[in-house]
């Protein structure tokens, strides 16, 4: 196995395992809730749902709720997969495995505290945007920029790989 294939497989395994660690509890929760509550098309007039006018995929939520759930799970899978792969980049900066393991959480939570408490920008926090019903059409560009930033940080791992010896 070449060094390039090894690091690519390491990245893919980390991405998939983190995405599954985020999505499996959501799927289990959905199945448990479906055992007790009826599944049906949500009615906008009741006002019982967090998806309101201006949310991304609001029409999908009210017309095709299962498709909305699938989109929500894919979004969560990708977001937390990218977030956890930051560990692979930070392994070159820090030698302590415990600190490397905590790096995604520390960055995720400190970004939330800095933006919400420090700057008062609640709509820009990745933690707040993790719930898709908090993503509005007018701030979708903020989410795309943050996900692109996570992707760029993850790609730094592959830049460092070129000079590494297996």
Place the predicted regions along the sequence by residue.
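Secretory targeting signals
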Residues: 11-88, 127-146
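Extracytoplasmic/secretory soluble proteins
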Residues: 112-135, 139-156
């Amino acid at each position: 196995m070449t060094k390039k294939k090894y690091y690519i497989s390491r990245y893919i395994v980390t991405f998939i395992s983190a995405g599954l660690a985020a999505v499996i509890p959501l799927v289990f929760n959905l199945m448990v809730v479906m055992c007790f509550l009826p599944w049906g098309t949500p009615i906008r007039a009741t006002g019982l749902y967090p998806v309101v006018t201006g949310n991304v995929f609001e029409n999908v939520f009210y017309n095709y709720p299962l498709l909305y759930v699938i989109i929500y799970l894919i979004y969560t899978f990708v977001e937390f997969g990218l977030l956890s792969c930051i560990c692979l980049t930070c392994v070159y900066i820090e030698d302590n495995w415990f600190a490397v393991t905590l790096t995604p959480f520390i960055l995720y939570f400190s970004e939330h505290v800095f933006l919400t408490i420090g700057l008062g920008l609640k709509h820009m926090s990745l933690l707040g945007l993790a719930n898709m019903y908090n993503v509005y059409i007018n701030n979708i560009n903020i989410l795309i920029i943050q996900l692109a930033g996570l992707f760029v940080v993850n790609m730094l791992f592959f830049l460092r790989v070129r000079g590494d010896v297996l």
